[in-house]
From Swiss-Prot:
Protein's organism: Xanthomonas oryzae pv. oryzae (strain KACC10331 / KXO85)
Highest rank taxon of the organism: Bacteria
HAMAP family, A to Z: Smg
InterPro entries linked: Smg
Pfam families assigned to the protein according to its UniProt record, in alphabetical order: DUF494
Assigned protein family: Belongs to the Smg family.
UniProt-recorded name of the protein: Protein Smg homolog
Length: 157
């Protein structure tokens, strides 16, 4: 089975984290569950490293949303994120779902995935995982979670 870090992360998110946010995150039991699900130890280790990096980059204090300059993307980011992905990030920032720090965290975590390109659905999962890990982002997380399962985007209020 050809799996990626994102496949492991999605499996963890769908089967463990989204069901019980207070789940004791015993790495050994999670790893055993992932191995039983058919993931390789190497990909599991990379996924745990990805999650560790996400938790280490948590902003210490929520900052108010301010309109700042437009983000200019590096060539590697342009290669990995198509125009739909970049437009979606801009949409999220303009509608105050993400602030600039969270956008940068999403970009960092997207670039850390072992995929040459991410499509919009993959990026949405990265955004959802970042928001899930952000204190004070419960409303943004709930909105984003709703968007994952709708064909048409719900308006932001």
């Amino acid at each position: 089975m050809k799996e990626s870090i994102l496949d492991v992360l999605l499996y963890l998110f769908e089967h463990y984290f989204s069901e019980d946010a207070d789940l004791v995150r015993d790495r050994d039991s999670l790893q055993n569950g992932l191995i039983q699900a058919g993931f390789s130890p190497a990909e599991i280790s990379k996924a745990f490293d990805w999650l560790d990096a996400l938790s280490e980059q948590r902003p210490s204090v929520a900052r108010p949303h301010v309109d700042g300059p437009v983000r200019i993307y590096h060539g590697q980011e342009l290669d990995k994120l198509d125009v739909d992905c970049r437009g979606f990030l801009l949409f999220l920032e303009q509608h105050r779902i993400l602030d600039a720090d969270q956008r940068e965290l999403v970009l960092d975590r997207a670039m850390a995935l072992d995929q040459d390109e991410l499509d919009l659905d993959d990026l949405k999962w990265v955004v959802l995982m970042v928001l899930f890990n952000q204190p004070g982002a419960e409303a943004a997380y709930a909105w984003m979670e709703t968007q994952m399962f709708l064909d048409e985007p719900e308006p932001v209020h």
